[in-house]
């Protein structure tokens, strides 16, 4: 028992030291975004819109991708004062032909792709056995398959130029699973694993990958009811502008992983890694009837047409 206790404490201390070193170590910018060509999926609202502003303010050439052309045109007008060139491509990234068209039109316009931001995503909540199978399939296709396939399509031009950056927008739930979000968590675990694996595969090729792990965020995917509920547990709900700025800053610094969501999010990730039983107990306490009811309501609303970011 004493050995087990010492092992657990040693693991927790080692994990804490690792995150402290990652947080405080000096970093040096390696990427200048001026005139770089940046594709952003899910760019019509929420975090995607905030990312468009963050890149535009750094004078990047921004390619806006989402399903709704009218919303994309609104974002285009908003960011045009900051950047020399904006390309709008209405597309359903769950479709192979649309993904190919995004890459083809970008290369036809700019001749290269410097940065790919896989941001588009959909979510749903509630008990897994009650979730709509069509919605689950769409989530797998948008959150995971589309990011992998679009990355596969842009890699040839990046590898040919020995230069490229891929920014994958994951979730803190990719490192610390939460009940009532089983399919969504599965897609984010998959995206995190894909990012980690591909980063090692592309070592020394000039192509770099960064994974962003946001916490709860003010977007169309989070209702006021959920915001109020998670706030009672002491979890911050961050603004997309803050998340976008931190993501772009981490990208230009060459960071591999950017963890957001406050101290509790970091503690949750550490607990998942070094004390999973403790985290399981915590989630059992969280699973109040009110939490289950709220998540079930979200799942029903999403099944009737929840939005993509």
Feature names for model-found ranges:
Residues 58-74:
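Conserved glycine-rich Rossmann-like NAD(P)H-binding loop of the short-chain dehydrogenase/reductase
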Residues 127-128, 132-137:
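Substrate-binding pocket helix/loop in short-chain dehydrogenase/reductase
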Residues 44-45:
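Conserved glycine-rich cofactor-binding loop
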Residues 69-70, 91-101, 133:
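The beta1-alpha1 cofactor-binding region of Rossmann-like NAD(H)/NADP(H)-dependent oxidoreductases
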Residues 171:
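Residue(s) in the substrate-gating loop at a strand-loop-helix junction
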Residues 211, 231-269:
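C-terminal helical subdomain
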Residues 151, 187:
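Active-site helix of classical SDR
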């Amino acid at each position: 028992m004493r050995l087990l206790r010492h092992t657990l404490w040693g693991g927790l201390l080692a994990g804490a030291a690792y995150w402290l070193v990652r947080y405080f170590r000096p970093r040096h910018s390696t990427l200048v975004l001026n005139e770089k060509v940046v594709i952003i999926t899910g760019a019509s609202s929420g975090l995607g819109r905030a990312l468009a502003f963050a890149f535009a303010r750094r004078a990047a050439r921004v390619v806006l991708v989402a399903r709704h052309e009218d919303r994309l045109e609104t974002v285009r007008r908003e960011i045009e004062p900051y950047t020399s060139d904006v390309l709008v491509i209405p597309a359903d990234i769950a479709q192979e032909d649309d993904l190919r068209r995004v890459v083809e039109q970008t290369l036809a316009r700019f001749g290269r792709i410097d940065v790919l931001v896989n941001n588009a995503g959909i979510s749903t909540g509630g008990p897994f056995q009650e979730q709509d199978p069509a919605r689950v399939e769409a989530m797998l296709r948008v959150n995971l398959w589309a990011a992998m396939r679009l990355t596969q399509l842009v890699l040839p031009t990046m590898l040919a130029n020995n230069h490229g950056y891929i920014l994958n927008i994951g979730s803190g739930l990719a490192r610390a699973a939460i009940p009532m979000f089983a399919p969504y968590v599965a897609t984010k675990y998959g995206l995190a694993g894909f990012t980690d694996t591909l980063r090692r595969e592309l070592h020394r090729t000039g192509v770099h990958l960064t994974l962003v792990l946001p916490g709860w965020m003010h977007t169309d995917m989070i209702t006021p009811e959920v915001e109020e509920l998670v706030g009672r547990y002491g979890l911050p709900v961050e603004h997309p502008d803050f998340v976008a700025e931190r993501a772009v800053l981490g990208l230009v610094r060459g960071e591999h992983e950017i963890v957001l969501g406050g101290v509790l999010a970091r503690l949750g990730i550490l607990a998942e890694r070094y004390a999973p039983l403790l985290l399981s107990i915590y989630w059992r306490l969280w699973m109040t009837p009110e939490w289950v009811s709220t998540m079930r309501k979200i799942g029903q609303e999403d099944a009737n047409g929840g939005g993509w970011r």
